């Protein structure tokens, strides 16, 4: 082999691409996406913020999770519940995109769409694009999810409290490189069927009591394949075109929340995907320089579904009042949510990871009847204040919360539509949160409807 490099083998720096062009391309990163993320344990009201921003968006995307998420949106007095579909699907002028980081249960997708069609959702299938690289959730994944919870309860006396939607088992299949994707379903169905049978057998060998109708599921999946075929695109190319074509407003709807993140959440009581800002890049196939605004959504108090440490939880009349006034029941599971005071250690931790550019503070009106409002501002461990959020559950359960007590406003805020309409004590509460976290509050929620979000700047 000759030691002389052929002219077409030389690297770009040797003259294949002009340096000025490289510099220009580096400067032109394309459009930037706006990201909406949960800053607590979920159920913060992300769907409402997304719905607000989606009114003038061109593309609304989901980047992770599956139909374990639960977003409620109220439009014209109608309440829509979304689990897998981006809640921006209501916007008839926008495209909704399910990215490669999402795990898709096809029966659940169509069931959800049909339920919302009865409430007024129209022509959703014409506005939905699904990444060909998204992994699939199968019925046996959901069955295994339930079996694993039963095993945990029997062996450890407690379970994780999953939604039993098959999300964890589906992501496990993905991580084990055994999962099946949308592109597999739409290619050679015989090959897909063979891999599906093998995957089902693997799960049956691990869970001998697992009962699954393999051939029945394959028959249904073949039907679903034809229904979704018109919606499926190469997701990476779709996003690249969207970012580098004519300027577009692109919105990313995060599911779950920071403390449910598989890497940064309160393990093991977490979900199985990255629901922090890094999941946007890996779940859509976009580079970090295309991340623009990152909005953190935080409830004016704290809630959690299922088990796990909860430092500011109020197992008393205050907790009951928050649960009752806030109608704190899980959208996906119907389970009662645990309630407590706002925890700023959690919020600061979520900000460290996500770099929020602004916050949306929701459900302020739920605090309207309280004489005083407490806010958790720091943790102590063995009598010493700690500056970090503990990774270990046992340690988190032992922390002592230091509270600041603020005066309540004892005024109905549900009619407020601008900053000046809020009582001075409510304004002070909002400023207190801003000052302690170091991030400005852009929206304040005082009710269910779209117009009950007060925009501050």
Curated annotation (Swiss-Prot):
GO cellular component, one term: cytoplasm
GO BP annotations listed: 'de novo' AMP biosynthetic process; IMP metabolic process
Protein's pathway: Purine metabolism; AMP biosynthesis via de novo pathway; AMP from IMP: step 1/2
Binding, substrate: 43, 331-337
SUPFAM superfamilies from the UniProt entry: P-loop containing nucleoside triphosphate hydrolases
Organ and tissue specificity: Predominantly expressed in the striated muscle tissues.
InterPro entries: Adenylosuccin_syn_GTP-bd, Adenylosuccin_syn_Lys_AS, Adenylosuccinate_synth_dom1, Adenylosuccinate_synth_dom2, Adenylosuccinate_synth_dom3, Adenylosuccinate_synthetase, AdSS_1_vert, P-loop_NTPase
Region ranges (Disordered): 1-25
Chain sites annotated for binding Mg(2+): 43, 70
Cofactor note: Binds 1 Mg(2+) ion per subunit.
GO molecular function: adenylosuccinate synthase activity; GTP binding; magnesium ion binding
Compartment(s): Cytoplasm
Amino-acid positions noted as binding GTP in the UniProt annotation, renumbered to this chain: 42-48, 70-72, 337, 363-365, 445-448
Gene3D superfamilies for this protein: Adenylosuccinate Synthetase, subunit A, domain 1 (3.40.440.10), Adenylosuccinate Synthetase, subunit A, domain 2 (1.10.300.10), Adenylosuccinate Synthetase, subunit A, domain 3 (3.90.170.10)
Key words, A-Z: Cytoplasm, GTP-binding, Ligase, Magnesium, Metal-binding, Nucleotide-binding, Purine biosynthesis
Catalytic site positions: 43, 71
Cofactor(s) demanded: Mg(2+)
Catalytic activity field: IMP + L-aspartate + GTP = N(6)-(1,2-dicarboxyethyl)-AMP + GDP + phosphate + 2 H(+)
Residue sites binding IMP per the record: 43-46, 68-71, 163, 177, 256, 271, 335
Assembly and oligomerization: Homodimer.
Family that this chain belongs to: Belongs to the adenylosuccinate synthetase family.
Function: Component of the purine nucleotide cycle (PNC), which interconverts IMP and AMP to regulate the nucleotide levels in various tissues, and which contributes to glycolysis and ammoniagenesis. Catalyzes the first committed step in the biosynthesis of AMP from IMP.
HAMAP family for this protein: Adenylosucc_synth, Adenylosucc_synth_vert_basic
Protein name per UniProt: Adenylosuccinate synthetase isozyme 1
Species per Swiss-Prot/TrEMBL record: Sus scrofa (Pig)
């Amino acid at each position: 082999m000759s030691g002389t490099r052929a002219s077409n083998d030389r690297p770009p720096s040797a003259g294949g691409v002009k340096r000025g062009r490289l510099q220009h391309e580096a400067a032109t990163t394309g459009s930037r996406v706006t990201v909406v993320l949960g800053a607590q344990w979920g159920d913060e009201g992300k769907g409402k913020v997304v719905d607000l921003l989606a009114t003038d968006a061109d593309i609304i995307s989901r980047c992770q999770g599956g139909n374990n998420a639960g977003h409620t949106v109220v439009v014209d007095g109608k309440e829509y519940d979304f689990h897998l579909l981006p809640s921006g699907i209501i916007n008839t002028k926008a495209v909704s995109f399910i990215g490669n980081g999402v795990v898709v249960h096809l029966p659940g997708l169509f069931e959800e769409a049909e339920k919302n069609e009865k409430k007024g959702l129209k022509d959703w299938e014409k506005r939905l694009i699904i990444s060909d690289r998204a992994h699939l959730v199968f019925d046996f994944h959901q069955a295994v999810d339930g079996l694993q919870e039963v095993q945990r309860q029997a062996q450890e006396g407690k379970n994780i409290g999953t939604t039993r939607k098959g999300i964890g088992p589906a992501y496990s299949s993905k991580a084990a490189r055994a999962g099946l994707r949308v592109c597999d379903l739409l290619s050679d169905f015989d090959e897909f069927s063979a891999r599906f049978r093998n995957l089902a057998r693997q799960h049956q060998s691990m869970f001998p009591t697992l009962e699954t109708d393999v051939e029945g599921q394959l028959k249904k999946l073949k039907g679903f394949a034809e229904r979704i075929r018109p919606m499926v695109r190469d997701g990476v190319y779709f996003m690249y075109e969207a970012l580098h074509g004519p300027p577009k407003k692109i919105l990313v709807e995060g599911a779950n929340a920071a403390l449910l993140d598989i890497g940064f959440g309160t393990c093991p009581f977490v979900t199985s995907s990255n629901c922090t800002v890094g999941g946007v890049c890996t779940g859509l196939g976009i580079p970090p320089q295309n991340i623009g605004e990152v909005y953190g959504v935080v409830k004016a108090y704290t809630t959690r579904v299922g088990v796990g440490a909860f430092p500011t939880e109020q197992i008393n009349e205050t907790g009951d009042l928050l649960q009752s006034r806030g109608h704190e029941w899980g959208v996906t599971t119907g389970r009662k949510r645990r309630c407590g005071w706002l925890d700023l250690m959690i919020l600061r931790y979520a900000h460290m990871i996500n770099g929020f550019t602004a916050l949306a503070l929701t459900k302020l009106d739920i605090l309207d009847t309280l004489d005083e409002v407490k806010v958790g501002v720091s943790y102590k461990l063995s009598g010493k204040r700690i500056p970090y959020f503990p990774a270990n559950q046992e340690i988190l359960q032992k922390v002592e919360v230091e509270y600041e007590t603020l005066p309540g406003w004892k005024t109905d805020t549900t009619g407020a539509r601008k900053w000046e309409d809020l009582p001075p004590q409510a304004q002070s509460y909002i400023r207190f949160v801003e000052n302690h976290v170091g991030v400005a509050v852009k929206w304040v929620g005082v009710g269910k409807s779209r117009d009950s979000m007060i925009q501050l700047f």
